[in-house]
Structure formats: structure tokens, C-alpha cells
Amino acid sequence: MSTAPEKTEKNLLDPGFELTLRPMRYPDFYERYRDAIKNTWTVEEVDLHSDVTDLAKLSQGEQHMIGRLVAFFATGDSIVANNLVLTLYKHINSPEARLYLSRQLFEEAVHVQFYLTLLDTYLPDPEDRAAAFDAVENIPSIREKAEFCFKWINEVEKLDSLQTQADRRRFLLNLICFAACIEGLFFYGAFAYVYWFRSRGLLHGLATGTNWVFRDETMHMSFAFEVVDTVRKEEPELFDDQLRQEVTDMLREAVEAELQFARDLCGDGLPGMNTDSMRQYLECVADQRLARLGFAPVYGSENPFSFMELQGVQELTNFFERRPSAYQVAVEGTVDLDEDF
């Protein structure tokens, strides 16, 4: 009597749509989903009233910087969310991972709502708000960053499944782009401007909301890097010199795109914030992303911004401690934001 062939266990990027959560193949992804639930916050908890007063105190150059920042925020997380649905959820074949991605999509929606609220508060003129939402079309420095994103989306959007090593390599580059370059560099650059204002006692509401967005984005990036680690264990042949060079070139291109944005925001420079210091900061962050991916750093720069060292950690911790017990979701362990800067 013949026996049924033994089922071959699939890899994370194998085509298919696994549904079974028991037994779990990737329990770490499930634990990340559970941890993310503990970090729930809502836009209504961010108080922007004092920001309106602060905005009136800003110099013309600082007001220009804020206008550009909220214009970038208006579209940045929407691009991330679209790639999450159209690419990551489609090709990461793990129900545990898809649980986390579902939660991440919710968090991206909260971020979009937060930035929408920022726009309504910071830009009361309807024409100014409309221009901010059209930033991808009418602001060259933001358009350059968007085109960088779309290039890596277009690389995989027509793939129905990851049948070949070439397909999987293209997917990995998309995943690394959104984790290391977009969430891990573009948004970290934006956070630096926010915390620069915060270090001067300005825009408390923006900084508070950014603390919570930052915590979410750090978890998103960490999840994506764990996916990369898992694929590296399952299919090490994908991680050759070609991929290393492509990722390094990608990070270099992302740094240059973000520097173009910095030139737009900083102009001739503001006290404590200029293009040269942003270049050093971005190079430092890019090196950290490369190191996390197991590749050699290329810049050797150090973080020039003292205000980025654990900025806002105490407030972030206090937020979760002071919530009403009927709504509170516990946060366990320590809050360490320093490493990823």
C-alpha cells in the first residue's frame, strides 16, 4: 500500500497562502503582533493647542521647514501603506506575519490621520492644505523621494508570485527599501527636524505624536529586518555580493534624495540645524541600517545631534503609565530608542 508523500515545509517566500496558525512556524512574528497591540494610541490623545501659539513665534525659515515637513508627512505613510497591502501582505507566506502586517496597516492609518490633523491645524488656509497634499507633484524635493519609492514598488508590483530567485531578490530589495530607506531613513530624517524644535521647547504636540509614530515605525522596521533574517536563514544563496552592492547603492541613493530635501528645508541654515549636520546624521543612520542587514557601513559618520539621544523617551514611557485602566495596554520592558538613531 502506497503512503501519501510527506509534506515539504515551505519557506517564508514560497508561493502560496498559508492559513494554519497551529502549529506556528514563525511564532516570533505572532509575538510582534501581540506587542504591537499593547502600543495602541489614538490621534485624539495628541494636544496640538500650544503648537498654534508656537507657530506664530517661528521665523520665516522655520515656518518654511514646518510647511515642507507636514507636506511630506501628508503622503509618506500612505505610500508605505500601499506597498504593505500590494506587496508585503501578498508575498510573505506566513499567517503569523500577516497578522502583524494587518496591525501595521492599522498603525499606518493612525499615522495618516495624525498628519491630516496636523495639516488642518498648521495650515488653516484651504489652498495651502491642497498644495501640501499635492506635494508629490509640485515640490521637487518631495517628488524626488516619492519617485525613489515608486521605483522599488514598480519592481515587484506585477509579480503574481515569487517563483524564481530573481523574483525573490526583487522582493527583498523592495522590503529593504521600505524598511531601511523609507521608514528607516526618510522618516528618521523628518523626526530629527521635529526633535530639533522640541529641544528648543517648541511644538510640543507635534513632538508628542511623533514619539508614538516613532515607536511604531521602529517596530515596523524591526519586523521587516526579522523577515530579512528569516529569508537569509532559509535561502542564504540570495544574499550574495550582488545583493550587498544593490542594497548599498540603494542606501546611497536614499541619502542623496533625503539630502535634497534637507537643502530645501534648511536653506542657508538655521541655528543648530543645517544641511551639513543633516548629511552627517543621515550617513550615520544609513551605516546603522547597513550594519543591521549584515553589510559593511560605507560612511563612518557619527550622530551630530545630541537632541536625538533618547529624546522624548521619558514622555513616551509616561504616556503608557498614565492611561486610564479601562483603556490601558501594558508596555513591558524598557524603552530604548538610541540604537536605531
Task: List PLM regions with ranges.
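Non-heme di-metal
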Residues: 2-341
